[in-house]
């Protein structure tokens, strides 16, 4: 038997090592600097600890702290340090789970006292002590019974509950650092001293295991990075995000509200409705030019429709129901089935296709109260859904046109975006060959358009693969909005047909398409992206006119009337307040243009223009200002 293993590195080189060499030792053989930066290893695609021993031939890559995978390991270990610090400080603590999330981590726990934000400083101090102790982190494999006995002795009832979900007979992995032991799959850093930059950010409540029937635990959130400068940059971003929080700005700018009478369901105030109307108008213009017909379907439809479509199996736990005339109806969680019924209502020839059907459809999906987040996570929202019914030979050309439409929308708002191709999920419908052909078709379209994309394994819709578009906002946060989905299943379920050139009935293919996704969510994203300072074409009030004194009101009203006639949303601040106060108020409301009008402006039929975010005022003829503004609005300029 060979005493060596052959290990293939990422560059294709094959190295021979003694059997049983650890990942850390292998990294050191490549370079000492790589060993210092190493956080974990990836053996045949699986993340493992640096202490993992190579006992057979394998592919190996070293995961460094500056990689995304390395940061996840760092953050996971920091979550364990958090839990250890809390147990040291507060004694009787029952630990839940402590996963890695985007940019950070959290740990759920049951304490004898309620934590407040003021407690975070003390916890951070103890975490730094643990880091300075540079405790070795050991992976320990135990039997189910040994793990059960250990956590029973420690009175860790939540860990015991997690254990119950693991089949008896399976090996259990624990991680130990000093006196602290946790149930965990890992991997982790080799020692606590490798953590250099972290910050606890907030405390909140969370249902144990996300179930509202369970007790509420305390959740402590934190962030961690390889370097302090990265942490500082992230904390600065969080400060900016707090300033741009759409919930705060929505209230400040009078855009929307929520009420306990309809939890998770937004009320649009007049100014907010203006913005929403502009978004819909923009979309309608583009869709009309692209050959879409707009339709409207009922909010509530028979339960059997959702069973027929397949949505019942995937959405029933999140649907709202009502009984009418002894028949059970459901508020629609999706617009798709209604569009299938509309298509089925008419007879189509192959010459009629594609049929492009669009709707601003209001849908309802129940979310747990703890998951609600302003406009970003609601229980009812408007989806800009379209369904394109095509022949098979039209699939790729129609997807290309849908992508071009999405690109035009996002460029108008100044969004960069990335693309994902999401493949077959476990709960999918249909045969393998159809899925493979569909995935190849979507990939071919993206490649022909020169769009780079990532594969998102297993995240397709249950009826077909999809292309997802992730926009980046001003703070470089990613939001998945637009989607294009290919569907061979729905036409089968609804027995949809058209007449082909041989006078035979054949199935169309359906392309599902959304650009904004949820208009309500997109609105919330826009508020944060622009910090509430909308482009002039979207702004609820585009021009605020302020008289120097009441004697200038007539001229102000004349200017307002002409602007309104030109389609500009213009207001006048006629309040009996000081000029400086009125100007500051218009800045707080983030109005794009403020016109301060006095004797000089009236005599010359001019305006004194203050643009939001600009230091310099400009004195220009009124007609020049109006013409320039009208053109800016028409072009939907930034």
Swiss-Prot record:
Gene3D superfamilies: 3.10.20.30, 3.30.54.20, Anticodon-binding domain, Bira Bifunctional Protein, Domain 2, Threonyl-trna Synthetase, Chain A, domain 2. It is an enzyme of class 6 (ligase). Catalyzes the attachment of threonine to tRNA(Thr) in a two-step reaction: L-threonine is first activated by ATP to form Thr-AMP and then transferred to the acceptor end of tRNA(Thr). Also edits incorrectly charged L-seryl-tRNA(Thr). Binds 1 zinc ion per subunit. PANTHER family: THREONINE--TRNA LIGASE, CHLOROPLASTIC_MITOCHONDRIAL 2 (PTHR11451:SF44), THREONINE-TRNA LIGASE (PTHR11451). Pfam families: HGTP_anticodon, TGS, tRNA-synt_2b, tRNA_SAD. Residues 1-64 form the TGS domain. It comes from Bacillus subtilis (strain 168). Its cofactor is Zn(2+). Its main location: cytoplasm. Disulfide bonds: none annotated. It is found in: Cytoplasm. GO terms for molecular function: ATP binding; catalytic activity, acting on a protein; metal ion binding; threonine-tRNA ligase activity; transferase activity; tRNA binding. InterPro entries: aa-tRNA-synt_IIb (IPR002314), aa-tRNA-synth_II (IPR006195), aa-tRNA-synth_II/BPL/LPL (IPR045864), Anticodon-bd (IPR004154), Anticodon-bd_dom_sf (IPR036621), Beta-grasp_dom_sf (IPR012675), TGS (IPR004095), TGS-like (IPR012676). Keywords: Aminoacyl-tRNA synthetase, ATP-binding, Cytoplasm, Ligase, Metal-binding, Nucleotide-binding, Protein biosynthesis, RNA-binding, tRNA-binding, Zinc. Zn(2+) binds at residues 336, 387, 512. This is Threonine--tRNA ligase 2. The keyword Cytoplasm applies. Homodimer.
């Amino acid at each position: 038997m060979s005493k060596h293993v052959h290990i293939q590195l990422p560059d294709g080189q094959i190295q021979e090592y003694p059997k049983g060499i650890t990942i850390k030792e292998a990294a050191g053989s490549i370079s000492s600097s790589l060993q210092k930066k190493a956080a974990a290893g990836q053996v045949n695609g699986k993340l493992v600890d640096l202490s993992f021993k190579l006992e057979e031939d394998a592919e190996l890559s070293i995961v460094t702290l500056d990689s995304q995978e390395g940061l996840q390991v760092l953050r996971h270990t920091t979550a364990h340090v958090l839990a250890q610090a809390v147990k040291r400080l507060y004694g009787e603590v029952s630990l839940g789970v402590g996963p890695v999330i985007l940019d950070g981590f959290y740990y759920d726990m049951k304490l004898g006292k309620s934590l407040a934000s003021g407690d975070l400083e003390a916890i951070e101090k103890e975490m730094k002590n643990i880091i300075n102790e540079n405790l070795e982190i050991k992976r320990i494999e135990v039997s189910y019974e040994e793990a059960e006995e250990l956590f029973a002795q420690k009175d860790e009832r939540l860990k015991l509950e997690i254990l119950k979900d693991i089949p008896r007979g399976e090996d259990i992995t624990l991680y130990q650092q000093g006196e602290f032991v946790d149930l965990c799959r890992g991997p982790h850093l080799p020692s606590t001293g490798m953590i250099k930059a972290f910050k606890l950010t907030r405390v909140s409540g969370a249902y144990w295991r996300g179930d509202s029937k369970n007790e509420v635990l305390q959740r402590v959130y934190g962030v961690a990075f390889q370097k302090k400068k990265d942490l500082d940059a992230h904390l600065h971003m969080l400060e900016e995000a707090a300033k741009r929080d759409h919930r705060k700005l929505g209230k400040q700018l009078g855009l929307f509200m929520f009420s306990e009478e309809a939890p998770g369901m937004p009320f649009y105030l007049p100014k907010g409705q203006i913005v929403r109307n502009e978004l819909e108008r923009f979309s309608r213009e583009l869709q009309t030019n692209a050959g879409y017909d707009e339709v409207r379907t009922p909010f509530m439809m028979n339960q059997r429709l959702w069973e027929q479509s397949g949505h019942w199996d995937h959405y029933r736990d999140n649907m709202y129901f009502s009984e009418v005339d002894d028949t059970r109806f459901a508020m629609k969680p999706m617009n798709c089935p209604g569009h299938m019924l509309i298509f089925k209502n008419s007879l189509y020839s192959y010459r009629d296709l594609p049929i492009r059907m669009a709707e601003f459809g209001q849908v309802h999906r129940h979310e747990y109260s703890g998951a609600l987040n302003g406009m970003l996570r609601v229980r009812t929202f408007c989806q800009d859904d379209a369904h394109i019914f095509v022949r098979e030979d039209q699939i790729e050309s129609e997807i290309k046109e849908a992508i071009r439409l999405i690109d035009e929308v996002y460029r108008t708002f100044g969004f960069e975006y990335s693309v994902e191709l999401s493949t077959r999920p476990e709960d999918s419908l249909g045969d393998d060959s159809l899925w493979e052909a569909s995935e190849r078709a979507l990939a071919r379209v993206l490649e022909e358009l020169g769009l780079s994309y990532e594969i998102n394994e297993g995240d397709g819709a249950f009826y077909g693969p999809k292309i997802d578009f992730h926009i980046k906002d001003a703070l470089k946060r990613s939001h998945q909005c637009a989607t294009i989905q290919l569907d061979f299943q729905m036409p089968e379920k609804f027995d949809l047909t058209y007449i082909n050139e041989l006078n035979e009935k054949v199935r169309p293919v359906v392309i599902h398409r959304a650009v904004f996704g949820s208009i309500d969510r997109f609105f919330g994203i826009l508020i944060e992206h622009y910090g509430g300072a909308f482009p002039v074409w979207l702004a609820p009030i585009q021009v605020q006119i302020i008289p120097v004194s009441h004697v200038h009101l007539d001229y102000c009203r004349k200017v307002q009337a002409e602007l309104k006639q030109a389609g500009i949303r213009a207001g006048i601040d006629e309040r009996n307040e000081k000029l400086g106060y009125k100007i500051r108020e218009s800045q707080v409301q983030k109005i794009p243009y403020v016109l301060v009008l006095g004797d000089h402006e009236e005599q010359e039929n001019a305006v004194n223009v203050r643009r939001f975010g600009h230091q310099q005022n400009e004195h220009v003829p009124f007609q020049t200002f109006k013409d320039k503004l009208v053109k800016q609005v028409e072009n939907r300029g930034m």
